[in-house]
Swiss-Prot record:
One of its GO terms (molecular function) is mRNA binding. InterPro entries: Ribosomal_eL18 (IPR000039), Ribosomal_uL15/eL18 (IPR021131), Ribosomal_uL15/eL18_sf (IPR036227). One of its GO terms (biological process) is translation. Signal peptide: none annotated. This is Large ribosomal subunit protein eL18z. Belongs to the eukaryotic ribosomal protein eL18 family.
Amino acid sequence: MGIDLIAGGKSKKTKRTEPKSDDVYLKLLVKANRYLVRRTESKFNAVILKRLFMSKVNKAPLSLSRLVRYMDGKDGKIAVIVGTVTDDVRIEDVPALTVTALRFTESARARIHKAGGECLTFDQLALPCPTWSENTVLLRGPKNTREAVKHFGPAPGVPHSHTKPYVRQTGKKIEIARGRRRSRGFKV
């Protein structure tokens, strides 16, 4: 007899074995990567494949300024991002970088090309170095900078909580009454 996992309070962990998206280009990438993982036994390829399965929230975009900061002192290496590379107007000069990503915004692509850099796709990267781990730097964007994440955490209003409340409008007196102002009872 088998064990009833769910009734026994145990649930088997699930993990994605394919992307949820119906994007045909993503499916082709997954197909190519599966082959590479199987034939090269490279951990780098396995990580890329796992990240290709991820949801959009977990494939956070990476700005050009962060990319430049992370690639400082890593000359001659290829930056690999399973996600989007976005432009950042706060950075003035972009060095010549070779970047591989799922997609680039138009302005980010233009700035990388203008600086003498290169924007590669994952299939273009697989041709020169199939195991990829040589001369590459695997990066990912910040996941918790989404607006939605600001609302997570201890309830707004409890002491020492910096959680953003869900309110219809913002203003001087909204969500800052009792416990937040001395004139309204007390201030924590």
